[in-house]
Every structure is written in C-alpha cells, then in structure tokens.
Amino acid sequence: MNIRPKCGCGGGADLMFCCSGVADTAEIGDRAVRLLHKEGGARMYCLAGIPANAELIMNGARAAERILVIDGCDTDCARLTMEAGGFTGFLHLRVTDLGMEKTKSPVTEERVERVARHAREMLAVAQGVGQ
C-alpha cells in the first residue's frame, strides 16, 4: 500500500477487507477472512468504513503494514471501494480466479480453506517469509 504510517511505531497490522456480497463466492471469501482473523495472522476490517470515511477505520487502514482485499467475483466491489478511498498497492485476491464459479459454488469448508490458504500465501510472500 502506498500510504505509510506517520508514527514512529514501525507500522501497523496486516489488515483484510472483503466484499461480503450476496453470492456464494462472496460468502466463501468472507468466511476465509473470518478464519484468518481468528487465527491471528491478519485482522479483518470493515469495508463499509472506507466510503463512510470512518475515522477509526481510515486511520487503521492508513497505518497498515499490508492490506489484503478479497472479492468474491470480477465485479471487484472491495477493490473498487478501496481505490475510491485512496488506497493503492494492496494485495488483491478474487475467489472466482481460484476456479469457483459465482452462484454455482456452494459454501464448503474445503472452499473456505482454499481461499484462506491462498490469502496466507499472498501475505507471507508480501512479508518476505520463506524467501
């Protein structure tokens, strides 16, 4: 992300924003983000706070070390929301790019874990882990 922390604290947490739309692929993405949040590797943040210009959300996003944005489909609502809020340079994962078809991919634990695994890998690469 191009916006960097202004404090001397060394940066913020890794944050995740997800479109939690009505399609099955959006629910899969949402559940994957919630799973990762529970694991503690990155924190789920409120996407609606970006267009609302909610101070707490905006400040947290600006201070983030890395941001991962997950969309369920190629409409890319979460990506577009973040860009409209002035954020660029974030990681982006689209559930349908993993072979799941919108409205034809029932939510299963296997699908949720598949998205979570890709998200973990993206964050690890961005952190330089294993390089």
Positions of predicted regions on the chain:
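Iron-sulfur-associated redox domains of electron-transfer enzymes in respiratory
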Residues: 1-131
